[in-house]
Each structure stands twice: as C-alpha cells, then as structure tokens.
Amino acid sequence: MKKSILFSLTLIFTFSMHAQNEELPYHQIPEYPENYSPGNVVARMIDGLGFRYHWATKGLTEKDLTYKPSEDGRNIMETLFHIYGMSEMIKNAPTATPNVRPMDISELTYEDLRKGTLKNLQAASQAMADKNAADFEDFKVIFQRGEKQTPYPYWNMLNGMLSDCIYHTGQITLLRRASGNPINPNISVFNGRLRE
C-alpha cells in the first residue's frame, strides 16, 4: 500500500514538474516573416503581443494576482480573464468562428489562463501568416448570444481586441511592479529576446 501511494505521488510530482517546465509560446518572438503581406504584418503584431504577455505574466505570485491599486480597478487576475476572452476572439476571427456569449471561464486558474492565452495568440498568428488583402474580407469578429449573431469586419479586431490586449498587458507590467515583483529586466521587446 505504501509503495502504491509513494509511486502515485512520484508520478503526480513528475507530471507536475513536466507541466511547469513545458516551454510556452513566445519565450522569444518568432523569426521575421519573408515579406510584408497584410497577414504577416498582423501576425507580427500578434507575436509582439504574445512576447509581451509571456513576460508580463511569467512568475506572478498570489500577491501579484490579487493586487489592485484602487477599489474600483481590476486586479491582475481579473485582467488575465479579460485578456483570455479577447485572445479567444483574436483566434476565432480568421475562421469567422462565432464568439458565444456568455462564456463561463470562471474555473480557469492563473496557469490555465496564461497557457490558454499564449496558445490562442500563437494559433491566431499562424492563421494570419501569408494572408493577402482579399483574405481579410472573410475574417470576421462574430458575437453570438442565443441564436442572434452580430458580425464585424476584421478592422474592429485591430482597433478593438488586439489593441486592448496590448494595453492591458502593459497594465499587468505596471501592477506587478507596484506589487513588488517587476518583470525580468533583461527583456528586449525591441529585439523580442531575452538579453544574455
């Protein structure tokens, strides 16, 4: 019996360590695309967001997640939920997949939100790669409540969700600094790499 419990605990610990060590997307920004097609430019913007988000959210503590500078502001955890929801929309737009509302993500943990957001951004970037201007006509932001669908052109994604995610990622960087846990000072957002 003791051997069985010990084996089970060892197995759980091993899987837990593997999950923690799993390399998430955007540790560094991907290589440049071959050309400046409209899809590649948008993909690069998504990659820039992914890189910033990766480092803004890496190593957050419980104190960081619950920190809020004022009573009426969002804390970091609430901001992570908000960004995750928008990352779903960024991922769905190239395939015109409806964003069904309301979406219940209340059970997601910090780790779930971080991994899910990074994977969504990676999928969105890959979906945009090498797309031309004509392809954008088929990309839609679609909100669905019940049977009612409201579509918007991809333009709204650029000035809406994509810009909003960049904005909120900056807020996370500021809030974690205020809570005493600043991001790694060796990050170069210009080069999309960690300085050696």
Language model: regions and residue ranges:
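Acidic/histidine-rich, surface-exposed loop or edge segments in extracytoplasmic proteins
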Residues: 27-39, 96-106
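Residues within well-ordered alpha-helical secondary structure of globular protein domains
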Residues: 59, 82-85, 119
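N-terminal targeting signals for Sec/Tat export/insertion, comprising classic cleavable signal peptides
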Residues: 29-64
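Short coil/turn linker and secondary-structure boundary residues
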Residues: 60, 74, 105-108, 131
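Surface-exposed helix-capping loop/turn segments at secondary-structure junctions
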Residues: 59-66, 128-138, 177-183
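Acidic/histidine-rich alpha-helical segments that form the ligand environment
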Residues: 108-145, 151-167
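Short, contiguous alpha-helical
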Residues: 21-24, 43-47, 51-54, 66-103, ...
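Bacterial Sec-dependent N-terminal signal peptides
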Residues: 1-25
